[in-house]
Amino acid sequence: MIDINHVSFQYSGAEQENLQELVLHIKKGECVVLTGESGCGKTCVTRLINTLIPHFYEGEMSGTVSIDGVDTRTIQPHDLSDKIGSVFQNPRSQFFSLDTDSEIVFGMENKGMPYQMMLDRYQQTLRELHIEKLKGRNLFDLSGGQKQTIAFASVYALNPDIFVLDEPSSNLDPEAIQELRRLLLLIKAQGKTIIVSEHRLYFLNGIADRIVLMEHGKLKQSWAASDFALLSDEQVKMLGLRSYMPTRLELPEITPSRNDTPAVEVKDLAIGYEKGEPVAQHLNFRVYPGEIVGVVGKNGCGKSTLARTLCGLQKELRGEVLYKNSKVPSKRRIRKAYLVMQDPDYQLFTDSVYQELLLALSDQKDKDEKRIDDILDELNLTIYKERHPMSLSGGQKQRTAIGVAALRDAEVLIFDEPTSGLDYKNME
């Protein structure tokens, strides 16, 4: 069904090939998982399959890609819209509407589907994906995980033969990941062909037919899923991959340097958007210097809203936020706390990774640029230091934003889903 024959590709402006002599054949109804370290070429392969390469992303390409025997160079992406549906790593980049209902029906409207058929398919999508609670919502009010769910719904509504999913679990909570697993089992039972680019592997156990490991733009190794499942956790880690089995996190006992003055404290805090009901309220907690606190909960429960409120990007509805026992207005909190956002695209501004980190030192008297080299080395970004941040993979962007945070002299560092785009090696 999908045949990639000796394909090499280099993005326009890239210093080296992003794919090298790739050979990959995918049968109808097969579920193939692409995995490997950030920047290994997984997303590039998905763009070959959905024909964004060579029709949207410019570069030098050799070799051939064919879908059902048709060379993708001879057809446009819209010619395959009935056959292929894609969910991008960043769902925001594929939205065309302002609300969830319009987004789900957008593709069907563009196909000129009869109204009653479109309405039936829309209602079927809500029902089968269990997303009735997201009906009629403003897309800008959704959490990252909810946006990812709507992006999947808009593709599912079109009923394509091939689903191309680029890190579909990256913004999902454990419950939503299990729901994604249910959906993948559903479309696999319908005979759909599924290509998944992922770092998280455990939820694909029992769904995947093949695991394909990418490294530096090459297909390093391929396993039948049954053979991959026989690898020990240690062998999987040696490959730089996350576990194929669910793991239980054991937190070490850590005693923070506690004194009587909390670094940050919230009192009877209510957070949310001005025109709506609070996302969360009656929040009371303290965080002391040296303490690491994890905030967990379902998608849409208010984790990101709390993070934005603590650092002053969003104003609280009620209550108080105190830094070192002093109430701090939202506008002044920006100097107290630094947030690494769920979507790092929002906070990358310069023309290179090095300049991005240098910018973090701009308001500091002692601009020790050696710290930049140390951070680049620590985050495995040294070889990318002259690259434009927008040309990086999702995980590389995430690490760049984390590097900026490490160089800031903020009293409190807040990380919103910092591991979402990271492979095992860089997560460690």
Feature names for model-found ranges:
Residues 198-199:
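H-loop/switch region of ABC-family ATPase nucleotide-binding domains
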Residues 64-79, 320-333:
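ABC ATPase NBD Q-loop/coupling interface
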Residues 116-134, 367-384:
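Conserved ABC ATPase "signature" region
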Residues 35-37, 296-298:
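The feature captures the beta-strand-to-loop junction immediately N-terminal to the Walker
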Residues 50, 311:
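Helix-to-loop junction immediately C-terminal to a conserved catalytic motif
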Residues 138-142, 146, 388-392, 396:
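Conserved ABC ATPase signature
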Residues 163-166, 413-416:
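Catalytic Walker B motif of ABC-type/P-loop ATPase nucleotide-binding domains
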